[in-house]
């Protein structure tokens, strides 16, 4: 910091959690639905720099995944900005995609 009048003191130790395994059954469903909604777009697992409460579930032995289902224009990414927005079509497509994803993953007909 450029100001020696300010100090930062960590409170407690960081909480870590194990990574969730890439379940092939889940990946298959995501790939199938992605191909229906956005043909030609590959499914690539990534790790977000953001944080969630998923670490508490993973530490309890519950695999936890983050997935938005929102398509954004790379030249107009405004996530968490003061002018945050997405296209209406992206919102509606993402809503339907996530609905069908949850329905597929929670049924016996995966």
Tell me the role of every PLM-derived stretch:
Residues 1-99, 103-110:
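Metal-dependent amide/peptide-bond hydrolase catalytic core
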